């Protein structure tokens, strides 16, 4: 296998490293929804999770392998430490996939060897070939990562990589685990590997990086120029700490600056062939989906997918864009799936028109989910004259893509004014099927609602983030509410949309509490000797 293909492999780790963002934990069904969206986006590889970490992760990887990892779909990958138990779990979870990959790793920096692994360099050199060879018994496609490569001794890392490739690794991934390197350093690191690992031409060079210094995307582009051909990234750049390299930024940099990067891939400068397999028109939709399901809000000035990415306030800029978009826009908003050509539905629109538009927007719903979404659509249409694509997206996200409904909001009623204390009454249906009602006074209507809900649910938590924004313009616009709760050090997110902001706030809170309550139930199923694991790769 050559490490010089003439296109770039996009390896998406949103469901594995991205999910390690505080509060970004997803249910199995939500992971499946995102995996399907990633397949439509055109990613080459989906790192679906860390199968040995928990029963939930194993189930998610297995289901994604079965439903998304078909013959025409992306390759499905599972992460595993360089231990037999981890690798076996990954191999078993990936069995249903038509194309699979095991990604195994072990640290190579002296600080990790001394303080985390408590192993010598010679011990690591013995572990690597044994574990890579073991992974090969489950799949022909094995990726190996020397964790914390950016701080590893280069000569030792060269030895480790040579050993891994000799044992059968088809991809070697170079992670800047703590986001420490600069672009020139990272480029030199990749060049050093190409120049000093004798059998490097038998494997693809991959890169994985974190954005602690805001340099992840720049590092990747420099690595590409020096021989890297696989980029490990996440939607919206989500991930631990400051996040990972953002898929949308990398893909659009390669799309817009194609002529600059062509020569580094052995292509003619003026070649118009895409450098990746990504369908860029799916970028914005996928970004919104991941944001809604994880509760990780996209900042307005975020490159490519932020709300202001294609907005112009300066009069000079506005005048230029009106005359010719290219004066101040280096890419067309339609290239990432943003369009003003929206079909407007109303209360007289039928089920067939509703289904057809959802299909056109890329939503794949079961008959049951479609029926629920259509009922919600009719409810909103009675309150709102025109239903746009953005409204449809909010309706689907709110009604279908929610945490398991353990607690259900049956009623919320608020009384407030300038000279009265805000008071809320709520009725919830509990997991046991009982209807419980309680009331509370708060500093405002939302505070009163949340206090009343807490009196019913009785699970201690701390509200650490509350965000509300309109889906469209107009006084009858739907409002989206995203919240984050903290409970015993873990963060849980909730999302809801409604033309009534108080109702949306209550539903978002219930959504987060359902995740929290579900996690508590799940923890009781995990044996104390099998703690939940996360990777720092």
Swiss-Prot record:
Cofactor needs: Mn(2+)
InterPro entries: 2-IPM_HCS-like (IPR050073), 2-isopropylmalate_synth_dimer (IPR013709), AIPM/Hcit_synth_CS (IPR002034), Aldolase_TIM (IPR013785), LeuA/HCS_post-cat (IPR054691), LeuA_allosteric_dom_sf (IPR036230), LeuA_bact_synth (IPR005671), PYR_CT (IPR000891)
Subcellular location as annotated: Cytoplasm
One Pfam family this sequence matches: HMGL-like
Recorded superkingdom: Bacteria
Enzyme Commission number(s) of this protein: 2.3.3.13
One GO term of the biological process aspect: L-leucine biosynthetic process
Keyword vocabulary terms for this entry: Amino-acid biosynthesis, Branched-chain amino acid biosynthesis, Cytoplasm, Leucine biosynthesis, Manganese, Metal-binding, Transferase
Residue span, Pyruvate carboxyltransferase domain: 8-273
Top-level EC class as recorded in UniProt: transferase
Main localization category: cytoplasm
Catalyzed reactions: 3-methyl-2-oxobutanoate + acetyl-CoA + H2O = (2S)-2-isopropylmalate + CoA + H(+)
GO cellular component terms, A-Z: cytoplasm
GO molecular function annotation: 2-isopropylmalate synthase activity; acetyl-CoA C-acetyltransferase activity; manganese ion binding
Region (Regulatory domain): 408-537
Residues where Mn(2+) binds: 17, 208, 210, 244
Pathway: Amino-acid biosynthesis; L-leucine biosynthesis; L-leucine from 3-methyl-2-oxobutanoate: step 1/4
Function per UniProt: Catalyzes the condensation of the acetyl group of acetyl-CoA with 3-methyl-2-oxobutanoate (2-ketoisovalerate) to form 3-carboxy-3-hydroxy-4-methylpentanoate (2-isopropylmalate).
Record-stated family: Belongs to the alpha-IPM synthase/homocitrate synthase family. LeuA type 1 subfamily.
Self-association and partners: Homodimer.
Protein name: 2-isopropylmalate synthase
Phylogenetic lineage: Bacteria, Bacillati, Cyanobacteriota, Cyanophyceae, Oscillatoriophycideae
């Amino acid at each position: 296998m050559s490490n010089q293909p003439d296109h770039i492999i996009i390896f998406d780790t949103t469901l594995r490293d991205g999910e390690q963002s505080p509060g970004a934990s997803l249910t199995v069904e939500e992971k499946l929804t995102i995996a399907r969206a990633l397949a439509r986006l055109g990613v080459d590889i989906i790192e679906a999770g860390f199968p040995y970490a928990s029963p939930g992760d194993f189930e998610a990887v297995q289901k994604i392998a079965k439903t998304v990892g078909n013959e025409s779909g992306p390759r499905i990958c599972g992460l595993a430490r360089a231990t037999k138990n981890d690798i076996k779990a990954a191999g078993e979870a990936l069995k249903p996939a038509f194309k699979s990959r095991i990604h195994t790793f072990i640290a190579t920096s002296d600080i990790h060897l001394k303080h985390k692994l408590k192993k010598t360099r010679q011990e690591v050199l013995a572990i690597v070939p044994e574990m890579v060879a073991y992974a090969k018994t489950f799949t022909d496609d094995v990726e190996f990562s020397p964790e914390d490569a950016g701080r590893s001794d280069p000569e030792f890392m060269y030895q480790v990589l040579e050993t891994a490739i000799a044992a059968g690794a088809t991809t070697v991934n170079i992670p800047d685990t703590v986001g420490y390197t600069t672009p020139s350093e990272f480029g030199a690191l990749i060049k050093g590997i190409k120049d000093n690992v004798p059998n490097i031409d038998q494997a693809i060079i991959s890169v994985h990086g974190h954005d602690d210094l805001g340099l992840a995307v720049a590092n990747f582009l420099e690595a590409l120029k020096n021989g890297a051909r696989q980029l490990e990234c996440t939607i919206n750049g989500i991930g631990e700490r400051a996040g990972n390299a953002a898929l949308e930024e990398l893909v659009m940099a390669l799309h817009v600056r194609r002529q600059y990067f062509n020569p580094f891939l052995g292509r003619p400068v003026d070649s118009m062939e895409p450098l990746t397999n990504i369908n860029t028109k799916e970028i914005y939709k996928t970004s919104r989906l991941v944001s809604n399901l994880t509760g990780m809000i996209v900042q307005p000035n975020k490159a490519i997918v932020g709300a202001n990415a294609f907005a112009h306030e300066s009069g000079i800029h506005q005048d230029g864009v009106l005359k010719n978009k290219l004066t101040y826009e280096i890419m067309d908003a339609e290239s990432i799936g943003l369009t003003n050509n929206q079909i407007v539905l109303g209360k007289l629109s039928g089920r067939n028109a509703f289904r057809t538009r959802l299909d056109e927007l890329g939503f794949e719903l079961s008959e049951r989910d479609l029926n629920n979404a259509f009922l919600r659509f009719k409810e909103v249409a009675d309150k709102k004259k025109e239903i746009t694509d953005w409204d449809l997206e909010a309706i689907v996200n709110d009604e279908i893509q929610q945490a398991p409904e353990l607690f259900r909001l049956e009623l919320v009623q608020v009384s407030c004014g300038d000279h009265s204390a805000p008071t809320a009454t709520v009725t919830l249906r509990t997991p046991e099927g009982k209807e419980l009602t309680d009331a509370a006074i708060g500093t405002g209507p939302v505070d009163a609602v949340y206090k009343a809900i807490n009196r019913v649910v009785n699970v201690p938590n701390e509200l650490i983030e509350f965000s509300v924004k309109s889906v469209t313009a107009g006084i009858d616009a739907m409002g989206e509410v995203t919240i984050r709760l903290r409970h015993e050090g873990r963060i849980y997110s909730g999302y809801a949309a409604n033309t009534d902001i108080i109702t949306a706030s209550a539903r978002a809170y219930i959504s987060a509490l359902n995740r929290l309550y579900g996690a508590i139930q799940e923890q009781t199923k995990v044996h104390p000797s099998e703690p939940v694991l996360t990777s720092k790769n």
